[in-house]
A protein has these predicted regions:
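Structured alpha-helical segments in the cores of large, soluble enzyme domains
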Residues: 107-109, 181-192, 217, 229-237, ...
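Divalent-metal coordination cores built from histidine and acidic residues
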Residues: 155-160, 167-204
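Core alpha/beta catalytic barrel or barrel-like domain that forms the active/cofactor pocket
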Residues: 187-208, 230-248, 267, 271
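Acidic, glycine-rich active-site loops and adjacent beta-strand->loop/helix elements
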Residues: 125-127, 163-168, 206-208, 237
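Intrinsic-disorder/low-complexity accessory segments
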Residues: 21-158, 204-205, 210-212, 216, ...
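Positively charged n-region of N-terminal signal peptides that target proteins for export
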Residues: 1-4
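Short, solvent-exposed turn/loop segments enriched in Gly/Ser/Thr/Pro and often Arg
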Residues: 162-166, 177, 232-240, 784
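Bacterial N-terminal signal peptides
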Residues: 7-17
Length: 931
């Protein structure tokens, strides 16, 4: 027996030695240690190294899809050799536990023992945060080659998904950094966005999944593996600390299962404790960071709506040595930062070592609590199914406020000071005591009035009818739900619910499913709390948006169904994307065709027609059957071929015209200029992507070309997105360094020198005015409405107080509406608004709002959109929303022979608000005689 043990030991030792010889260390492969000063690996090298790691039986290399630039995005699965052989079995268990369908608690308990916990660790999402991908390299090497007890236990209990989040960005940033021979001069100030279209916003795309990388990642997270833990690495940590991480600050989203929040706190505590045990100070959490768990849309945060424990760390460190500064308040130990770090010089390798410790903390926690994590994911999914199968009321601030209002209406309120405010102690300013008692003693009947009110129940489901103006966009919305791992059903025949008839082909989403939080989040408004530093103080800036309800943004028509319902519904398989329904092919019609202006896809068809040389017109007045703005196309074989394809692929319905209409205006393809700048603009990048999807030809134009003048000879339309036009008295562009990304002119490579510069009031605005006067069209979005002020048009900022005869913008404690959906009224008579309805949901991010001067109309300025109520909030947080009543959200202004269209709301925000895309598209055609 002793000889057998010796033989086994020798075999294991030799296999480990051979493995070490087969797999090169990072130093051997890259020529430097990961974390060495002034050294970065690019994607080509990293991809090759990860393929080297596949020599280990602990690994499986998976290509998860192509990036926007055509690179292969990979995921390295790491576990014990035994587990690698049975990956499909463990993947199936992970998905079963996540879906929680058809399982008893006993069966789930057994599966939690039979399965392996799945942990996702990614790197490189934000390419300039170079620690992310480099810690992934180092951690993967350690997991593949180490044979200590902790690593072996981790490999036995965990399935680890090591995911490259942004191959294109790593290649760009690292190549740029390393091409400089002098290490002291190396920098990351690249001339363009490090994700082809959206740069930093690639971490805001996880519920829309516009980018290919987002689709690749979410497919693994929500369909293929559904990990129990997702760890998303970022930089940089708050000044005076090393790393910010979980537990996170409030608020958290009220749709989550409470077990999710306590699980995040548990893992976060394990991470903090690991660093403390290793003598690594500087971890800050909760109030020590800006990061919350409210937002849906990030690689970490989107997982919360799928019952996954999502983790984020933001850590200091760069290839160039840096310094931890003196921040006195960070030097006081407290619950946010129990072990402060002292000011010191900091090297990149230290950040790599911290990351390795944190990764091991997460993996060790997962190994020790493998069955709990698996079972708890099941439990959260089961809870969701049960909540969606009965009457349920989600708790939120609006429900709490409604109880208070019910109590106030039921008995007289008294001075709040008598009872010490809300809860008697530490209450918000203005808290009301009801009937002489503290709010905590409000009668139960007032609770019942709200949280047992059948009209206030959460919906049992939603119906998206075929019968809506833009069903093609509704199908896109349905596919987002399917990509997000939701159960979607489709009606195989007509049916009736609550007395309303629905056609076959309509879609149904019920809430009795494991990812119920995600279902509700797609349809229901977010109810963000009033979050201030202290009563009467400034607002606490949210991590990102506060309201984003996708169905609102996309303009989807749907019905909320509060009671259980059934019908001839066929369940769609998980991940089975829906093809666009087939529209009837247009008949041969000698008088031509009408195309609806209400459907976004109509613009694709129109642009394809124009590119094919087919004449296209728009109705300037409504006909007996078609609204104003409808497209008219004369019959030709070429036109019919384009429309046949559009009917088949885009669900564009071409309606036969009984005769050629009289009140029509020809349109042509316009020469479109889209502003951008050195270093890249995310709003411009998103707009660029949108225009490519809808087949608008355009040219990206940089400030120097604008300043060269003679714009009308080159362009018909100019698009100025947020950040392009400075406010009066300031220079343009939202990147530093005079539009050079922080570099001196001499450091810019020759091929990019024409990209530098910025728009200015002094030089650029007069040239833009000349362009307008000559008949050009300019569209501004968001803050670029500053152009109207620079042109001295009869419009003013509506959100100001007048102090000492001067306009002073509202303070944050008076007005604050960050990343929120509001309802605006629309003048549908205006050509700029063709295809729109009388009201529209708009994305408002502390956006410009206008008051028109008394003589504005006589000077050619017309309101396009405005806020007609003192409560325009639809989803999110709108402090001071009453100040918006009757203010203008968008306007058109005649300037000479041209027109300026200014939209305060973000009508193209991250390519999400399909409901307002037409507000841009309508302005992108040249009007006049056919060529």
């Amino acid at each position: 027996m002793k000889k057998i043990y010796i033989a086994i030991f020798c075999s294991m030792f030799l296999s480990g030695s051979l493995l070490a010889q087969t797999i090169p260390s990072p130093k051997e492969f890259f020529g430097f240690n990961i974390g060495d000063d002034y050294q970065l690996a690019n994607f080509t090298q990293t991809e090759a190294y990860f393929k080297k790691l596949t020599a280990s039986p602990r690994t499986k290399y998976v290509d998860i899809g192509l990036t926007e630039e055509g690179r292969h995005q990979f995921m390295l699965v790491i576990s014990s050799p035994e587990n690698i052989k049975k990956l499909e079995q463990y993947r199936t268990i992970s998905k079963k536990m996540a879906h929680a369908e058809g399982l008893t608690d006993e069966e789930a308990h057994q599966l939690s023992l039979d399965g392996k916990v799945v942990v996702w660790i990614d790197g490189g999402l934000h390419a300039t945060e170079v620690l992310g991908i480099h810690q992934l390299i180092e951690t993967s090497y350690q997991l593949v080659t180490r044979n200590d007890d902790e690593t072996k236990k981790i490999l036995d209990k965990d399935i680890i998904l090591m995911v490259h989040a942004n191959p294109d960005g790593q290649e760009l940033i690292s190549n740029w950094y390393m091409k400089e021979k002098d290490p002291q001069k190396r920098n990351m100030n690249v001339p363009r966005l490090w994700e082809k279209y959206v740069g930093h916003d690639n971490n805001r795309d996880s519920y829309m999944m516009n980018m290919k990388e987002s689709q690749n990642i979410t497919h693994q997270q929500f369909l293929d593996w559904i990990p129990q833990i997702v760890y998303n690495h970022h930089q940089s940590g708050p000044a005076g600390s090393v790393v910010a991480g979980p537990p996170f600050r409030d608020p958290f989203n009220y749709l989550y299962d409470p077990l999710l929040m306590t699980s995040i706190d548990e893992v976060g505590s394990a991470m903090n404790s690991r660093l403390n045990a290793e003598g690594k100070p500087g971890y800050t959490q909760r109030s020590g960071t800006e990061f919350s768990t409210w937002f849906n849309g990030g690689v970490r945060t989107a997982t919360y709506f799928h019952n996954t424990v999502g983790l984020l760390t933001e850590m200091i460190g760069s290839p160039a040595p840096s310094t931890i500064p003196v921040v006195p308040e960070r030097l006081i130990p407290n619950s946010a930062t129990p072990f402060p770090v002292l000011p010191q010089t900091w090297h990149f390798r230290q950040s790599v070592e911290y990351s390795l410790s944190l990764n091991y903390a997460v993996l060790n926690y997962a190994a020790r609590h493998s069955d709990e994590l698996l079972y708890n994911m099941y439990r959260m999914g089961k809870n969701s199914i049960e909540r969606g199968s009965k009457d349920y009321w989600t708790l939120s601030p609006k429900r709490s406020d409604a109880i208070v209002e019910a109590a106030k209406a039921g008995r007289p309120a008294v001075d709040s000071t008598a009872g010490g405010g809300r809860g008697g102690r530490g209450g918000a300013a203005g808290a009301v005591t009801i009937g002489g008692a503290r709010n905590g003693n409000i009668a139960l009947k007032y609770y019942d009035e709200v949280l047992k009110n059948p009209e206030l129940r959460d919906p049992r489901g939603y119906i998206i009818s075929v019968d809506q103006p833009d069903f093609a966009t509704a199908v896109k919305f349905v596919n987002l739900c399917i990509r997000s791992g939701l159960i979607v059903q489709k009606a195989t025949a007509a049916f009736t619910v609550n007395g309303k008839n629905y056609p076959a082909g309509s879609y149904i989403l019920k809430t009795n499913q494991a990812f119920r939080p995600e279902v509700l989040d797609r349809f229901e408004p977010e109810n963000h709390p009033n979050d201030f530093l202290y009563p009467g103080g400034p607002p606490i800036k949210p991590y990102d948006m506060t309201g984003w309800t996708v169905a609102y943004q996309m303009g989807i028509k749907f019905d909320r169904i509060l009671d259980d319902f059934n019908g001839p519904f066929q369940r769609i398989s998980y991940g089975e994307l829906q093809p666009m329904p087939l529209a009837s092919a247009p008949a041969t019609a000698k008088n031509g065709y009408f195309i609806s202006p209400t459907a976004n896809n109509s613009f694709i068809a129109v642009n394809d027609l124009l590119q094919a040389g087919v004449g296209v017109y728009r109705l300037t007045e409504a006909s007996a059957t078609q609204p104003a703005g409808s497209f008219y196309v004369a019959y030709s074989e070429k036109a019919k071929a384009v429309l046949d394809k559009a009917a088949k692929e885009l669900y564009v319905k071409a309606v036969t015209a009984p005769k050629k209409p009289k009140n029509i205006e020809p349109i042509n393809t316009a020469r479109i200029a889209l502003w951008d700048q050195y270093g890249g603009s995310m709003p411009s990048g998103w707009t660029r992507w949108m225009m490519e999807q809808y087949h608008f030809p355009f040219k990206v134009v940089y400030p120097q070309e604008f300043d060269a003048g003679d714009l009308k000879s080159k362009f018909d339309v100019i698009i100025l997105v947020g950040g392009a036009v400075p406010p009066p008295g300031r220079d343009g562009g939202n990147f530093g360094g005079g539009g050079r990304g922080g570099r001196s002119a001499g450091e810019i490579p020759d091929e990019y020198k024409t990209w530098t510069g910025r728009l200015t009031v002094e030089k650029t605005v007069p040239l833009l005015k000349t362009f307008l006067e000559a008949g050009g069209t300019i569209v501004t979005v968001g803050t670029s409405a500053n152009l109207a002020y620079a042109l001295n048009l009869p419009v003013h900022n509506a959100l100001v107080d007048v102090v000492g005869g001067k306009e002073v913008p509202f303070s944050g404690d008076k007005f604050y509406i960050p990343g929120t959906i509001l309802r605006a009224s629309v003048d549908t008579r205006q050509p700029a608004n063709y295809g729109m309805e009388n009201e529209v949901d708009v994305m408002f991010d502390n956006s410009p709002v206008f008051k028109l001067d008394a003589d504005a109309a006589s000077k050619g300025v017309k309101p396009l959109m405005w806020f007609s109520t003192d409560k325009p909030l639809r989803s999110g947080w709108a402090w001071g929303q009453q100040y918006l009543k009757d203010d203008v959200a968008a306007f058109s202004a005649q300037v000479g022979a041209g027109t300026l269209y200014s939209f305060g709301p973000e009508i193209t925000f991250r390519a999400q608000p399909h409901g307002t895309f037409k507000l841009l598209f309508n302005e992108l055609y040249k009007k006049g005689s056919q060529k």
